[in-house]
Curated annotation (Swiss-Prot):
Record organism: Takifugu rubripes (Japanese pufferfish)
Stated name of the protein: Fatty acid-binding protein, liver-type
One GO term describing the cellular component: cytoplasm
Compartment(s) where it occurs, according to its Swiss-Prot or TrEMBL record: Cytoplasm
Keyword Hydrolase applies: no
Sequence similarity: Belongs to the calycin superfamily. Fatty-acid binding protein (FABP) family.
Keyword Transcription regulation: no
Amino acid sequence: MSFSGKYQQVSQENFEPFMKAIGLPDEVIQQVKELKSTSEIEQNGNDFKITITTGPKVTVNKFTIGKETEMDTITGEKIKTVFHLDGNKLKVSLKGIESVTELADPNTITMTLGDVVYKTTSKRM
């Protein structure tokens, strides 16, 4: 199943507690909490390019499944990590954050840091 496509965020759960847990300042959280993001995923075999647009901020990450890559995080840090594909789930671990992007109807992303779980749901456009 291909992840390729454009997705519009439709809902999110536990945004503020999760963003505080990863260290985003309160003023930044307040500025972005009502913004809905758009994600574009381009998949060519095991090669991916993910472009996330939230308000004026655009983040682009490219990676190959199973190979170490450096990616930009929501906090602005660059982190080395490895992405894995497990059926319809794209998994990555970033500094203690476990992220699972599950391709379902709709598309669901769940991120966990300790016992704080952030869930965002997007719809394919």
